[in-house]
Curated annotation (Swiss-Prot):
It comes from Alteromonas mediterranea (strain DSM 17117 / CIP 110805 / LMG 28347 / Deep ecotype). Belongs to the bacterial ribosomal protein bS6 family. Keywords: Ribonucleoprotein, Ribosomal protein, RNA-binding, rRNA-binding. One of its GO terms (molecular function) is small ribosomal subunit rRNA binding. Binds together with bS18 to 16S ribosomal RNA. InterPro entries: Ribosomal_bS6, Ribosomal_bS6_sf, Ribosomal_S6_plastid/chlpt, Transl_elong_EF1B/ribsomal_bS6. The gene is rpsF. Residues 103-133 have a biased composition (Basic and acidic residues). Transmembrane segments: none annotated. Coiled coil: none annotated. This is Small ribosomal subunit protein bS6.
Length: 133
């Protein structure tokens, strides 16, 4: 069996169907002793460019070990499902189990101006204009 990384994008209006789709697709991959190593639901995200006049899509990532027949069946299921906007199946050398960069926590960066309340900034601005006059 080979290792695969699978990403698919679902129409945003059909986001409530995603858990059922994930269950159906993981069942296909687990046929003949396949195994899912990583499953991440990235949720609705902004698209880099519009697809079918849509600007958002629901993303799902699966890393699995499966047979070629199971992957062919999965690709066939993607092809005939109108809710799937795009999909990508890549073969990888090893199983990937650590969280993807999309799922890792990012510290929120604050703008430098936002650290001071607006009123204090306004007071400082009036003080500097008075000093210059």
């Amino acid at each position: 069996m080979r290792h695969y990384e699978i990403v698919f994008m679902v129409h945003p209006d059909q986001s409530e169907q995603v858990p059922g789709m994930i269950e159906r697709y993981t069942t296909i991959l687990k046929q003949d002793g396949g195994q899912v190593h990583r499953l991440e639901d990235w949720g609705r995200r902004q698209l880099a460019y519009p697809i079918e006049k849509l600007h958002k899509a629901h993303y799902v990532l699966i890393n699995a070990e499966a047979t070629a027949e199971a992957v062919d069946e999965l690709e066939n299921a993607f092809r005939f499902n109108d809710v799937i906007l795009r999909n990508m199946v890549m073969r990888t050398k090893t199983a990937v189990t650590e969280p993807s960069p999309m799922m890792k926590e990012e510290p929120r960066r604050e703008r430098r101006d936002d650290s001071a309340p607006r009123q204090e900034r306004a007071e400082k601005k009036t003080e500097t204009t008075e000093d210059n006059a």
